[in-house]
């Protein structure tokens, strides 16, 4: 397998895990519960994006205390 294929398979696995995990949640958990679950799955992504808005972080994904206002 090439590197690109391995990355694609990894991302699809993360996506599938996220969908299954989110389906088992109740809607009352809200956005914070979803972010916490994703943070457990892909911690390096959220570390890079936390506290700023960039090409991989098109919207604010952190608590309001550390996340700058968009616009």
From Swiss-Prot:
Species this chain originates from: Conus bullatus
GO molecular function terms listed in the Swiss-Prot or TrEMBL record: acetylcholine receptor inhibitor activity; ion channel regulator activity; toxin activity
Signal peptide: 1-21
Tissue: Expressed by the venom duct.
Location of Asparagine amide modifications: 70
Domains: entry comment: The cysteine framework is IV (CC-C-C-C-C).
Cell compartment(s), UniProt: Secreted
Name of the protein: Conotoxin Bu23
Propeptide feature ranges: 22-37
Superkingdom of the organism of origin: Eukaryota
Cellular-component GO terms for this entry: extracellular region
Similarity comment text for this entry: Belongs to the conotoxin A superfamily.
């Amino acid at each position: 397998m090439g590197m690109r294929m391995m990355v694609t398979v990894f991302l699809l696995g993360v996506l599938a895990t996220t969908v299954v995990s989110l389906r088992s949640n109740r809607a009352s958990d809200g956005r914070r519960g979803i972010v916490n679950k994703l943070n457990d799955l892909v911690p390096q992504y959220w570390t890079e994006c936390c506290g700023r808005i960039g090409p991989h972080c098109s919207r604010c994904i952190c608590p309001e205390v550390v996340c700058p206002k968009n616009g």
